[in-house]
Swiss-Prot record:
Interacts with ATG8. Pfam families: Peptidase_C54 (PF03416). The active site is at residues 174, 369, 371. It comes from Medicago truncatula. Cysteine protease that plays a key role in autophagy by mediating both proteolytic activation and delipidation of ATG8 family proteins. The protease activity is required for proteolytic activation of ATG8 family proteins: cleaves the C-terminal amino acid of ATG8 proteins to reveal a C-terminal glycine. Exposure of the glycine at the C-terminus is essential for ATG8 proteins conjugation to phosphatidylethanolamine (PE) and insertion to membranes, which is necessary for autophagy. In addition to the protease activity, also mediates delipidation of PE-conjugated ATG8 proteins. It is found in: Cytoplasm. It catalyses: [protein]-C-terminal L-amino acid-glycyl-phosphatidylethanolamide + H2O = [protein]-C-terminal L-amino acid-glycine + a 1,2-diacyl-sn-glycero-3-phosphoethanolamine. This is Cysteine protease ATG4. Disulfide bonds: none annotated. GO terms for cellular component: cytoplasm.
Length: 487
């Protein structure tokens, strides 16, 4: 009973986060203070790794404490830790462990409906199940799917960015990290397929390691935070400053083009065209943004340098769906986008804190949180079994979907022309069901009228500010709550 109470207290402590901003390092780390720094608050991302590990030790939670602090904690607990280790290895304790970790990591119920995770449905509804075994299997499948998504968080200890003293992106880099996660999933789907899962009992896939290397924290890594900031200068990106979804999408467009020109004769590091769907080039406003089929074809032709008419395509749709909150009429539409097989989720989150939303269950939005601070790691292909644990999360977090910030961007990955045609068909149907207020529409060309129209819109771009509130500098010329910003 004492052990159970202790476990419950530890689990409750690990699962008590009430917001997406679990910032455990509130300092910016200049290059001059890189050496000798120590943080006493550095929780692991996974409850599994901090409590129920084979080498059980309480001081693992304080991995960056000073050596003297570690010795004190370890000596105080080594006696009962050895005893508990024996209990943990037992079958009854293992079942208890699974029950505790399952509730903490998923916090979902079969009564809440099915979960849609990046185009895949995990059918956990009670009426879909024939027994406890089926429920456990479905939950396990969901957990494995969630765990296999690539997590990219704040890092500290990397080389200073350009001429600045910043060796960490703590408190300002959450949108950049969220966007890295979305692009990483696109690469994962492209190279390994949507059904790929990360396993602990098999050798890691080379393609998977290649993807992680692209997102390292140095100028040598193609899609690093260093190179994103360089590519996004024209859209206001700067070291230590916050950025909005629209500028982030355009930055990826620039970075991909720069990388393509740099590797003109070699293999493309981002083997897909990028199409940012955000209104006319001359700035004309009005209605929902339009996925123009001719523009998509043009992007593919440019990417292949005219060699083939179609290539894999990454679509990014930045939107502002309200003023201080998302207009509720858009919530069902956002939910439906996760049912698209092409779904890459949403760049967004609570006001002031960008996250990467990858799934929904009714009114819940499951997300990966970039706000945990982790030390820089160097993933190389030379290591036989590289440690990639910091790129995955065993704890699934969720927030109410109607609480997300109205400034967001939706991503889709289309593998080929048939996949794009399927996306267009689904998007058109979704627009037809929107009661006149679609997220976006589809048209063959810019000269054709939009299939579905919505109210006039106006506004300025907004940026994520990583505090408790989001400063929204929106101008609502029409004075209508349903109006949203056309980017």
């Amino acid at each position: 009973m004492v052990l159970k109470d202790l476990c419950d207290r530890i689990v409750a402590a690990k699962c008590s986060s009430k917001s997406s901003t679990e910032i455990v390092d509130n300092t910016q780390v200049p290059a001059s203070s890189k050496a000798g720094s120590s943080d006493s608050k550095f929780p692991k991302a996974s409850l599994w790794s901090t409590f129920f590990t084979s080498g059980f030790s309480v001081d693992e939670t304080y991995s960056e404490s000073s050596s003297s602090e570690k010795k004190t904690v370890h000596s105080r607990n080594s006696g009962w830790a050895a005893a508990v280790r024996k209990v943990v290895s037992g079958g009854s304790m293992r079942r208890f462990q699974e029950r505790v970790l399952g509730s903490c990591r998923t916090d979902v119920s079969s009564s809440d409906g099915d979960i849609w995770l990046l185009g895949v449905c995990h059918k956990i509804s009670q009426h879909e199940s024939t027994g406890d075994v089926d429920i456990r299997n479905v939950f396990a499948a969901f957990e494995q799917d969630f765990f296999s998504r690539i997590l990219i968080t704040y890092r500290k200890g990397f080389d200073a960015i350009e001429d600045s003293k910043y060796t960490s992106d703590v408190n300002w880099g959450c949108m950049l990290r969220s966007s890295q996660m979305l692009v990483a999933q696109a690469l994962l789907f492209h190279k390994l397929g949507r059904s790929w899962r990360k396993t602990v009992d098999k050798p890691v896939d080379k393609e998977y390691i290649d993807i992680l290397q692209l997102f390292g924290d140095s100028e040598a890594a193609a899609f690093s935070i260093h190179n994103l900031l360089q590519a996004g200068k024209g859209y206001g990106l700067a070291v230590g400053s916050w950025v909005g979804p629209y500028a982030m999408c355009r930055t990826w467009e620039v970075l991909a083009r720069n990388q393509r020109e740099k590797n003109e004769q070699g293999e493309q590091l981002l083997p897909m065209a990028i199409y940012v769907v955000s209104g006319d080039e001359d700035g004309e406003r009005g209605g929902a943004p339009v996925v123009c089929i001719e523009d998509a074809c043009k992007r593919c032709l440019e990417f292949s340098r005219g060699l083939v008419p179609w290539t894999p395509l990454l679509l990014l749709v930045p939107l502002v769906l309200g003023l201080d909150k998302v207009n509720l009429r858009y919530i069902p539409l956002l939910q439906s986008t996760f049912k698209f097989p092409q779904s890459l989720g949403i760049l967004g989150g609570k006001p002031g804190a960008s996250t990467y939303i990858i799934g929904v269950q009714n009114d819940k939005a499951f997300y990966l949180d970039p706000h945990e601070v982790k030390p820089v790691v160097n993933i190389t292909g030379d290591t036989q079994e590289p440690n990639t644990s910091s790129y995955h999360c065993n704890i699934s977090r969720h927030m109410p979907l109607d609480s997300i910030d109205p400034s967001l961007a939706i991503g889709f990955y289309c593998r080929d022309k048939d996949d794009f045609d399927d996306f267009c068909s689904r998007a058109t149907k979704l627009a037809e069901e929107s009661n006149g207020a679609p997220l976006f529409t589809v048209a063959q060309s810019r000269s054709l009228p939009m299939q579905v129209t919505s109210n006039s819109v106006s506004g300025d771009d907004t940026r994520f500010e990583e505090d408790d509130s989001l400063s929204m500098n929106l101008v609502n010329d029409a004075g209508n709550e349903d109006d949203w910003q056309f980017l």
